[in-house]
Amino acid sequence: MVLTDRQRADLHAGIYEYLQSRGDAYQKVVEALAQADPECTIPHTTTTSNGSSAGLTKTPLLEKKWTAIPRLQKKVLELERQASHHAKIHAHRSAAGSGGGALEANDGAGGARRLLPRLPCQHTLQGHSSVVTCVRVHPVFTVVVSGSEDGSVKVWDHESGEYIRTLKGHTNTVNGLAFTPTGSHLASCSTDLSIKLWDFQTYACIKTLRGHDHTISSVVFLPFGGDLLTTTKCKRLLSASRDCTVKVWDLETGFCDQTIHDHNDWVRTLATRADGSVWASAGNDTVIYVYEQDRMKKAVELRGHEQVVESIAFLTQDTIPKNNAQRPSKHIETVRDYLVSGSRDRTVRLWKVSEASCLMVLKAHDNWVRSVLIHPNGNYILSSSDDKSIRVFDIKNERCLRTLENAHNHFVSSLDMHATLPILVSGSVDQTIRCWPLD
C-alpha cells in the first residue's frame, strides 16, 4: 500500500509523538526521526470538514489511529447484524403476507415442514441471579425479555445470544410480561403490587399502576376494535392477582376501570383473543372463566382440571393457515372458539369455549404443567413442565409428537414463540433462558 504525502506525514508525526512520550529510552530514535523528517516535530492539529483548524489533538495521534480500527470493525459488524435482522424480518413479513402469517417452510416435496423445536438449544442466556419466572418474545425484532425473582427485567437478542440491558424499577419478583401488538411498549407485573409500563424504544418506565392488594401474577394488553397484528394502540390492560381479582386498567389515565371478583382464589394467568373481543382468566380455583370484552361479564365457565391452572392460550384465526384443509383438528369448525390450558394436574386440555366442553386431555408430563402456547401454524400445542421437559403435541392426532427432555436443569417455568421467526424461548428455575431453533 502506497501512502500519500499527508498520510506519511501523519504517520511520522504519530510515531514521533508516541516515542517522545516514552521517555529517554527512545531518545536517539526520536532525534533520528526528527532529523529525517523535521515536520513530524510540529504539533499535530486536526481539521474540520471545511478545512479550518480544530486545534491541537488531545488524544495521542498513534493511539487514536490504532484504536480506531477495532472500533470501526465493531461498528461494521453491528451494522451488518442489523441489516441481516431487517432482511429476515422483511422476508418473513413477505412470506406472512402470501401465506397466512404462520411459521411454515417448504419440505421440497410440495408440503410444509413442521418447524418444531429441537435439541440442542441455540443459546443459553445467563445473567439473572434468581429464578426466571417469565419470558416474552418481541413481536417484530429478534429480542426477548425475561422477568425474574431478582426483581429485574432483562433484554436480550435471541439471535446472537447477546445481553442488551436491564430494566430496573420493581422491588420484588417480576411475575408477568406483555408486549403491545407492535412491540412499542412493554408491561411488567410484580409481587411488589405494581404494574409498570415501559417505552420499549427508550426503555424508560412511563407509568406505574397500583391497586391490587396482593401479588400480581399476569398482565395482558387488551386490543379493541382491531386485529392484534394491526392494532397500533392498546387502551386497556388486564391484570390478575393473588387478591382473587382481575382488574381492567385505562392506560391513558392510569386508573382502574373495573375490578372483577368471579374467582375465589389466586388468579394466576390471563389470555386474550387476537382481536380482544374475548379474554379468559384462570388460577388456583381450577376454573377457567371466559369473558366478552363488550360487556366485561363472565360468559362461560370451563371446568375439568383437578388442580391449579397455570397457563391458558387461545387458538385463534391468526394461528391457522388460510387453507381450510390445514385446520388443526378434526373437532374444529370455528377455530376462534378454542382455548388451551395447562395445569398442576399434569394435563394439557383443549376446550371448545362456546359449548364449555373439553375436547381432549393430553397426558404426557410427569409433573406440573407450567406454560402452554399454540404453534403459529395452529397444528401443535407446546408445553413446559416441572419435569424439566418441553413437549410438542399434535392436535390432529391427539398425541405427544416431540419431547425435549432435560430442556433445563430445573423446572421450565415459561415459554414463548415468535409468530414468524423460527425461534422458541424458555425460562427456568435454573436462572437461565434458552433459545431453541426450529426445524
UniProtKB/Swiss-Prot annotation:
Cellular component terms (Gene Ontology): centrosome; cytoplasm; microtubule; microtubule associated complex
Matching PROSITE patterns: WD_REPEATS_1, WD_REPEATS_2, WD_REPEATS_REGION
Family per record: Belongs to the WD repeat LIS1/nudF family.
The protein's name in its UniProt record: Lissencephaly-1 homolog
The organism's taxonomic lineage, starting at the top: Eukaryota, Sar, Stramenopiles, Ochrophyta, Bacillariophyta
One GO MF term: dynein complex binding
Protein species of origin: Phaeodactylum tricornutum (strain CCAP 1055/1)
Segments annotated as WD repeats: 127-166, 169-210, 212-259, 262-301, 304-361, 364-405, 407-439
BP GO annotations: cell division; establishment of mitotic spindle orientation; microtubule sliding
Keyword terms, alphabetized: Cell cycle, Cell division, Coiled coil, Cytoplasm, Cytoskeleton, Microtubule, Mitosis, Repeat, Transport, WD repeat
Protein task: Positively regulates the activity of the minus-end directed microtubule motor protein dynein. May enhance dynein-mediated microtubule sliding by targeting dynein to the microtubule plus end. Required for several dynein- and microtubule-dependent processes.
HAMAP family in the cross-refs: lis1 (MF_03141)
Record region (Disordered): 85-106
Coiled coil feature spans: none
Subcellular location: Cytoplasm, Cytoskeleton; Cytoplasm, Cytoskeleton, Microtubule organizing center, Centrosome
Family annotation (CDD domains): WD40
Keyword Cell cycle: yes
PANTHER family: F-BOX AND WD REPEAT DOMAIN CONTAINING 7, WD40 REPEAT PROTEIN
Main subcellular localisation: cytoplasm
Keyword Ion transport: no
